[in-house]
Design a protein with these regions (language model features):
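Conserved anionic group-binding/transfer micro-motifs
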Residues: 7, 33, 164, 387, ...
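TRNA-recognition modules of translation machinery and tRNA-sensing kinases, especially anticodon-binding
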Residues: 112-427
Length: 446
């Protein structure tokens, strides 16, 4: 949400903003509605003041008339308030001065690369092929149970995922981030507060007959954690991280790297969230980016960083970096992380303020730390000629020292003594279904 006072004082800035953002917002219509609303508010305030100041003699004679006028004002005010809010809610955020101008991700500006793309003396397999061969990724049964866009991590696949997210959470907590286990269901207000509503409603799983939704990122549960609060300035910054399942419709994603599990309806994500003072948001945006790159380097995934252009940035974003990992199966860089400075856009919608030597709305940073996509890159980039997958060194300690994923072998499970558990019933006095009915007892014994 933007500052309405700024709109009144500098409408030309907003006309230019919606032009650059390719937004369909009519700034002049918004200004006109705002002016009408303010005039009607003044009229209502004058009537209320008149009602309050009526003498006893005139009260009986005139109060009824003034109250009728006030009653007539209510629907007028509400209609104008609703119209203004409907437009205001869709006004995009300002943009950082160094944001590239462009229409799509093709115009994003590459700013850095790290790592060498793996070279193979064989044709590399895709993560779907490797996952099926190794028995670590089951897309077919995911579709059987839940439909397309769902999947199972199995065996060492599940262990690899656990290892990767444990590694990332350990790294972030060592750097001062507080870990959370958040709800995965929130009120729709939480998505409005974070700027996902009204822009991304078609991407959201809404629960029937309720005001509840499934989160598409823990940003939607972590930022509203401080909704309608005023934070002591001395407590800032607040550094939060959470690992959650995430749910997205991915409407209109056909043809956009939908092969395998790159673009799905449910995935897992570790998020970085920062609430800070306005003058520090650029710094924390860069800190989150450093964390992203340290994670990618630790996982040995070659990557590039791009500065996102105007046409590829969501409405709440002020400045955004995307990090794209190399995927040997795709043969190209693909997005694995997004890292956005949202300045005060979310805080105004969520009403998160700070107070101290200075006061105002906090700034927020939202950055991916890890998603399942990184596992795809690990599987595709670290494959061997035999079809095995080498485990990155930083993850080996989380997998009991295992260095490689090979096809799962059936293992006989050692039988343990459980007779003492059955023996607990001996000597207990109670009525069972077989008491007094030999036929029933004989049937159940079979």
């Amino acid at each position: 949400m933007i500052d309405i006072k700024l709109l009144r004082e500098h409408p030309e800035l907003f006309r230019e903003l919606v032009r650059i953002r390719n937004s369909d917002i009519n700034v002049d219509e918004l200004i006109n509605i705002d002016q009408q609303l303010r005039e009607q508010q003044q009229k209502t305030e004058a009537l209320q003041s008149e009602l309050n100041n009526l003498s006893r003699q005139k009260m009986i004679e005139e109060a009824k008339q003034v109250k009728e006028q006030l009653a007539q004002q209510e629907p007028v005010l509400k209609e104008l308030q609703d119209k203004r809010k409907q437009i205001l809610d869709r006004v995009p955020n300002f943009l950082a001065p160094d944001t590239p101008v462009g229409e799509s991700d093709a115009q994003n500006l590459e700013v850095f690369r790290w790592g060498e793309q793996p070279k193979f003396d064989f044709t590399p397999k895709t993560h779907e092929e490797l996952g099926k061969k190794l028995g670590i990724l089951d897309i077919e049964r995911g579709a059987k149970v839940s439909g397309s866009g769902f999947y199972y991590w199995v065996g060492d696949g599940a262990r690899l995922q656990n290892a990767a997210f444990r590694y990332v959470e350990d790294l972030l907590t060592e750097r001062g981030f507080v870990p959370f286990k958040t709800p995965v269901v929130t009120k729709s207000d939480a998505l409005y507060a974070t700027g996902y509503f009204p822009f991304s409603q078609d991407e959201t799983y809404c629960i029937n007959n309720s005001d509840m939704v499934l989160i598409g990122t823990s940003e939607q549960s972590l930022v509203p954690y401080r909704m309608n609060e005023t934070i002591e300035e001395s407590s800032l910054p607040l550094l939060y991280t959470a690992f959650t399942p995430c749910f997205r419709y991915e409407a209109g994603a056909a043809g956009r790297a939908t092969r395998g599990i790159f673009r799905v309806h449910q995935f897992h994500k570790q998020e970085q969230i920062v609430l800070c003072k306005p003058e520090e948001s650029e710094y924390w945006n860069l800190v989150c980016q450093k964390n992203v790159e340290d994670i990618m380097q630790g996982l040995e995934i070659p990557y590039r960083v791009v500065l996102v252009c105007t046409g590829d940035m969501g409405a709440p974003g002020f400045k955004k970096y995307d990090t794209e990992g190399w995927f040997a199966g795709f043969g190209e860089y693909r997005e694995t992380h997004s890292n956005s400075n949202l300045i005060d856009y979310q805080a105004r919608r969520a009403n998160i303020k700070f107070n101290g030597k200075s006061k105002g709305f906090v700034h927020t940073i939202s950055s991916t730390a890890l998603t399942d996509r990184a596992l795809i890159a690990i599987i595709e980039n670290n494959q061997t000629k035999e079809g095995y997958v080498k485990i990155p060194k930083v993850l080996q300690k989380y997998m009991g020292g295992q260095t490689e994923i090979r096809p799962a072998q059936h293992k006989d499970v050692e039988r343990v003594d459980v007779s003492y558990l059955k023996d607990r019933l001996n000597g207990l006095q109670y009525e069972s279904i077989g008491d007094g009915n030999p036929e029933t007892l004989a049937f159940f014994k079979k």
